[in-house]
Amino acid sequence: MTPRLRLQPESVGIGMTSQRVRDRLVERLREAGIHDEATLNAMQTVPRHLFIDEALASRAYEDTALPIGHGQTISQPWVVARMTEAVLQVTPTKVLEVGTGSGYQGAILAALGLEVYTVERIGDLLRQARKRFRHLGMNVRSKHDDGRIGWHEHGPYDAIVVTAAAPALVDALVDQLAVGGRLVAPVGGASSQSLVQLTRGADGTIEQQVLAPVTFVPLLSGMLD
């Protein structure tokens, strides 16, 4: 897969210095075990600095989570890459993201040419993310709603990416996963979380695998404007 962006490199801030820091980030991701070239190309291409506050722009290509307001964060690049790599293994076409946040994870998926549906419970974050999607020419379908219920109208999905942690996998989301599809989500509480992938077999059986220890904000119910 080749990342798809409408803007020219200069429009997304790929100057000499910016390209070097992106290259270094990709090399760090390789060293940390990310091997899927499509994922790495998307991580190199999508301008992470556009998804954070300007005051933090100098840290945009560090492999660390950063605050985006409302008690939320933009995930660590390694985590974004690992979740993306995991869902690409089932060759998805249609993906549901639960927790739009800054829009960065959704942008990575959209840059890979996937049909992306994303749900965010915090209205202000969703409005900002939509502006970024438009700026980058990305056709990401978004909804202001309680992410725990998913987006049933457009299901089932080949892949589901959950960007906030619940004590257990949410049944309503698992039910929206297509046969042969994969769901990747952080599971656990404040003190201990694991990144879990769940794959629905052709016979409907569910296979679950723990990928890595992680730290995410909690998956909450309800909506905020």
From Swiss-Prot:
Identify the domain of life. Answer: Bacteria
What's in the keyword line of the UniProt record? Cytoplasm, Methyltransferase, S-adenosyl-L-methionine, Transferase
Show the InterPro entries listed in the entry: PCMT (IPR000682), SAM-dependent_MTases_sf (IPR029063)
Q: What's in the GO CC field?
A: cytoplasm
Quote one Gene Ontology molecular function term. Answer: protein-L-isoaspartate (D-aspartate) O-methyltransferase activity
Q: What does this protein do?
A: Catalyzes the methyl esterification of L-isoaspartyl residues in peptides and proteins that result from spontaneous decomposition of normal L-aspartyl and L-asparaginyl residues. It plays a role in the repair and/or degradation of damaged proteins.
What is this protein called in UniProt? Protein-L-isoaspartate O-methyltransferase
Protein source organism: Xanthomonas oryzae pv. oryzae (strain KACC10331 / KXO85)
Q: What is the lineage of its organism?
A: Bacteria, Pseudomonadati, Pseudomonadota, Gammaproteobacteria, Lysobacterales
Gene name as annotated: pcm
